[in-house]
Amino acid sequence: MEQIHVSPAGDDSWPGSQDRPFATLERARAAAREAGGKAVVHLRGGVHVLTRPFELGADDSGTVYQAAGYGAPEQEEPVISGGREITGWRVRDDGVWLAEVGDLDTRQLYVNGRRAPRAAVPGLPGTVTATETGYVTDSSEPLSWQNVEFVHRGVYPWTEARLQVAGIARAGGSTVITMARPGYEWAYALYQSVYEGNASIGPGLPTSVENDPSFLREPGTFVLDRARPGAHVLMYLPLPGEEPASARVVAPVLETLVRLAGAREVALRGLVFAEATWLRPGRPEGFVHYHGSGFYEGGPVERAELGEGSYVTYPLSSVTVPACVQIEDADGVEVTGCRFTRLGATGLSVSGGDGVAVRRCAFDTLAGGGVTVTGTRSAAIEDNRVRGTGLELSGSPGIAISGTRGCVVAHNEVTDVPHCGIVAGAGEGTHILHNLTARTLQVLADGGGVYLSGPQGDSADTGAVVRGNVIKDTVTPYNFGLYTDYGASWVLVEENVVMRADNTAVLHVGPPLENVTYRGNFWDADPVGHDDPPSGVTYEGNVTIADEGALTAATQAIQDRAGVRS
């Protein structure tokens, strides 16, 4: 194998040797192609800044991209970044830092590696009325707002929308807020429900409002002022002790870092992918979230009947939040020992292809989910740690798969996420084995530590298996440890452990479950509907042990096996 080296301190006119490395990934890729794909590209430590997405295709089949010293104690840490370092700060009298950033557009900011949230206030001031075009309030405070974004958390218990404002004007004694279209129009079409006799239409009142300079009240937050096109101003209220001369402030610019399409046997090892954004929620279309990583872009909606006159509407088709690293229609690709952090969308997506493996990776500090896998065969998602994801798109699962065949999700740890830990939509032959989820569903509701919906096969041989998982602390209201939902069928749920859940599991859902078996599970409270299982559910040999110490002792072998293997 040809050995190629690349370093931020290198030079593309050099030969790409260990002593005289290339400077850019593009030059290293060209050299690897010249070697017919039989090459290992060693990335030296430091920040490899991209100015455009790094593309890998069929011509790159067989190439390995890995950290220098990969697998050795002296392994280096190469960071593939789509960010721009912000300098030239001036400090206002009130302590706010200001930087002229031209036409920079971003939704995130990182200070010394820490995520700085956008400045926000809770909801709209005054007495507020929702209309078909926006809102009316008797407060004059919004008249000074510019480029703000409305966040609508919990329109449905599992949704969080983000919508833009088109204009704010005074009309008599009222302030009229006109929302941007088509986003607000789509929200009005999608969010229609009746629950316990109460009808609701539209997104309702915002639960928070983000990104106006007047909101800079909490240290460690930022605003991007875009009032003057092409002359944007970044504003940051520092934490105590932070100084502009010594702080490293990075604004993500690219939306995609790496796109790998149509390749075979490519390996990514020991790399850090960081500092990318996703600008779509800030556009007039907004982010009309429906479920998980899916959002609505108009089109037909239908009712999901919940019984007793209750219903919600749902889209017949939805779009998936993109990932900052994308693998498409690739076979035999390996992603091992990588970290996905400080990203403005999903960390990694796998779509199509066969035999893609994601192992021993870390996913943290992400606006969206950790990993999404769609329409692929024989994928393996194993021994990964997912923590602190869904920081801006709260419905995002830690790990989500849909439309797959023979996918294995095993020995992962998913913790501290706002909604579901592991989600499996309709598919065939999914195996969810020996995972650990903890402190999931911290923000939104009606989800599960492990959640499945839709048909999972057409027989016991082709169905899903959920075995040996340990699910802890889904404690927020109206949530479940194990959740087979919305017409799930051909699912075997056995030998799992559920502790400290609002509800351990639920057996009665709509549409009803078919050919679902709960067998030999352990939990600290009986599932909802255990005493009267529906006809489509087999419920046998499950054990309820209310005492935590006794439950732990009885399930120690299962718990020892769950989670990331050393």
Q: What residue spans do the PLM features occupy?
A:
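C-terminal structured domain segments across diverse proteins
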Residues: 397-399, 404, 412-417, 421-484, ...
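Extracellular polysaccharide-degrading/modifying enzymes targeting complex plant/algal/animal polysaccharides
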Residues: 5-329, 334
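Acidic/polar low-complexity surface segments
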Residues: 245-249, 273-324, 336-337, 346, ...
